[in-house]
Amino acid sequence: LHGDDVTDWEPDVRAKQGMFLAFQYPQEIPGVTVNNFLQQAVSARRGEDQSVLDTRRRIMGWMQRLEMDAKFAERFLNEGFSGGEKKRAEILQMAMLEPDIAVLDETDSGLDVDALKIVASGVRAVKEDRPEMGVLAITHYRRLLDLLQPDHVHVLVDGKIVASGGMELAQQLETDGYEAFR
């Protein structure tokens, strides 16, 4: 991150320095609303308290872009959320936190076709607003890549990059499987 090895950094330090991680299975945080969570997270990321009104306006704007009901902001974070709602909540967090790099760990896991399209559209919207932001999308399936249209595709086997290329590599992986890369 910015030329530094972040391996030994604590998660909060990574986040404050501009790294965002969307989890495959986001945790529920009972008692903390989406709105309050984002207010605190944005203030922590920027290193100073943020205007509640301005933050709320940004939240509502992004929620609209992500096709989320405004009532969503008052729900407890991830509590009782569907898989698609959890993923959209994470994309909302990514949009609000404005990271330098976003790591999306199997963001497509458990999503139906419609939810996947909304999430991918949200990632693209954040990327359009912040073209300098890097996105590392980790997936086992090509469908997310088809929607995101990444600049580069890398195949990892046993924790090592064994091939790099473009979308043609994703097609080859889908056709031939991981065994072709061992």
Predicted segments with their positions:
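ABC ATPase NBD Q-loop/coupling interface
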Residues: 1-14, 78
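Q-loop/switch helix immediately C-terminal to the Walker
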Residues: 21-25, 31-46, 58
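Hydrophobic anchor residue at the start of the ABC signature
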Residues: 90-91
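ABC ATPase C-loop
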Residues: 94-95
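Walker B catalytic motif
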Residues: 103-107, 114
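Helical segment within the ABC ATPase nucleotide-binding domain
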Residues: 116-131
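Conserved H-loop
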Residues: 131-140
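Conserved beta-strand-loop-alpha-helix hinge in the C-terminal portion
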Residues: 156, 160-182
